[in-house]
Amino acid sequence: MRSPTVTTKLQQIAEQAARDPDRVFWTLAHLIDEDFLREAYRHTSKSSAAGVDGVTAQQYAEHLDDNLRDLHERLRSGRYQAAPVERVWIEKEDGRQRPIGKPTFEDKIVQRAVAMLLEAIYEQDFYDGSYGFRQGRSPHDALHELRERCMMEGIGWIVDADISGYFDSLDRPHLREVLRKRVNDGGLWRLIGKWLRAGVMEKGVLSHPETGVVQGGVISPVLANIFLHHVLDAWFEREVTPRMRGRCFLIRFADDFVIGCELEADARKIMAVLPKRFARFGLTIHPTKTALVAFRKPDGHTPSDMGNGTFDFLGFTHYWTKSRQGFWVIKRRTARKRLRRTKQALWRWCRTNRHAPLKDQYHMLSLKLRGHFQYYGIRGNVRRLEVVSRYAEKAWRYWLSRRSSKSAIRWEKFQQLLETYALPIPRIVHNI
């Protein structure tokens, strides 16, 4: 629970923003006092690695009162300086590398404080079709709405779009222009500017990108969400939807979105104008990863039990198929790219950790499988869950057998091992 003082401040801001959608907030930075910073600290993740200064959350907490008092004084006097973020790379599903930035823990606290202020305002503006980086709005909520609207509104066409390198290519002058429609506080702007200009440290080399926001920062997803709200969501609701002849909708999770249309002509109009809209703000719709998918409900004369058109969204392939009762329904299964990436990750992990104590291997492998089942365990996807489960057993046995020349494990012995170290079984978690 937030402290009453901070809660009251944020509620007042939210009420003002809701009452007047055109209101511009000029004075917000002064609200970030020691109590506000303490609340931001409480809502900052303590589990991530240290930034370039090497200070962990645990070390910062050892002298929390002094640290927050000093931080507030530096913020108040303008002496606060943002540190560069440390860049690490993670593998994407297509095999490419994605850069992730690690801010210092202190910078995360200040970013969280600013994010709390911005969220109090923009949560009143965001549309129901926006799900990413919003409290209480999960990917599974987005998947549920997508399925329901496709089935109930006679949607026949899906615009499956992809933004090229959104976080890296986000145009900062345009971002400033968008934010100033609601927030024009010089103090907040100076803080945001310091984070954007702080630079990126990679292998001891400091660089200063002129575009984009660093993925991994606390403030980055908030800024990115606000920008796409203006570039895409508000534009779609105010300018696109009224011009359509049939029903249509937009569902977005962070920078991943789909548009559903009842009529093909409407979908093609959107496909034609979408790249132009994004280009106005320095963004690019990927030409080969963006497609128009025929996704209409099959009629009674369709001979197959499977409809033709499919599309991927949030790690799932969406498709029409017949239920056990013989009715056409939309189901979801783990997308092939995600399935392949999961299997590759399991294989690499079992290979890398094959010499670790068996109990430790079992514990970590179980955590990985539970995490996978927790996300992908939706109704109709049990077969893909079983594929992952069987592959985990296969990879584990293979690399346990290669710990030494004498450690080969036959299936019979491995089954006995699984009686002691039983891996989690696939289960459906989300009935959506």
Question: Can you annotate each of these PLM segments?
Answer:
Residues 1-432:
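Non-catalytic terminal/accessory segments
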